[in-house]
C-alpha cells in the first residue's frame, strides 16, 4: 500500500470508530504513533503523537505525548489503543478521546514485579494483544515472560 522506509514499523491496529484508519508505531528512530487513512485519495502518513525522533515519556493529549521505542499496538472492544512502550518499560493507553495514559509500569524503570500502576514493573515490553473479553496479554521481553494484565 505504502512504503514506510523511514519508519521502523512494528505494531498496527484499526479502531471500530475509524475502520479505514490504520494506526501504527514507529520504533527505534522516531518514537511516534502514526495514522494512515486507507480511503484517502492520496495515501499520506500522518504523525499523531509528539516528538519526532525524541524519546521520552509524557501522558496527556496524543499530539503532545512522548513515547520511547513504542513497539506493538492493539485495540480493545472500547476503542482504546494499548501500546507496549518498550523503552519506557510501560503499558500505555490511548483513549477514544485521544488522551494518552500510563496504565502499568514505572517510566524508565525496568524490572519484574506484579502489582498496581504505581508498583508494576516490566523490562522492555514488546508484544501486546487483547482477547475477546478484553484481557490484555503482554510479551515482557526482558523478563522472558508472557503476562496477563488486569487494568481498571
Which stretches of residues belong to each language-model region?
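Conserved beta-propeller blade signature
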Residues: 21-24, 80-83, 135-138
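A short loop-to-beta-strand structural motif that recurs across blades of beta-propeller domains
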Residues: 30-34, 89-93, 99, 144-148
Amino acid at each position: 500500500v505504502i512504503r514506510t522506509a523511514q519508519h521502523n514499523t512494528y505494531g498496527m491496529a484499526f479502531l471500530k470508530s475509524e475502520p479505514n484508519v490504520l494506526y501504527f508505531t514507529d520504533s527505534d528512530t522516531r518514537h511516534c504513533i502514526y495514522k494512515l487513512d486507507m480511503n484517502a485519495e492520496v495515501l499520506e502518513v500522518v504523525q499523531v503523537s509528539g516528538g519526532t525522533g525524541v524519546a521520552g515519556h509524557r501522558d496527556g493529549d496524543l499530539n503532545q505525548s512522548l513515547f520511547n521505542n513504542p513497539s506493538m499496538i492493539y485495540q480493545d472492544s472500547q476503542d482504546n489503543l494499548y501500546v507496549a512502550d518498550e523503552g519506557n518499560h510501560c503499558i500505555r493507553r490511548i483513549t477514544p478521546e485521544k488522551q494518552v495514559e500510563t496504565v502499568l509500569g514505572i517510566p524508565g524503570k525496568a524490572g519484574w514485579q506484579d502489582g498496581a500502576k504505581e508498583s508494576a514493573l516490566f523490562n522492555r515490553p514488546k508484544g501486546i494483544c487483547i482477547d475477546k473479553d478484553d484481557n490484555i496479554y503482554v510479551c515482557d521481553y526482558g523478563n522472558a515472560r508472557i503476562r496477563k494484565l488486569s487494568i481498571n
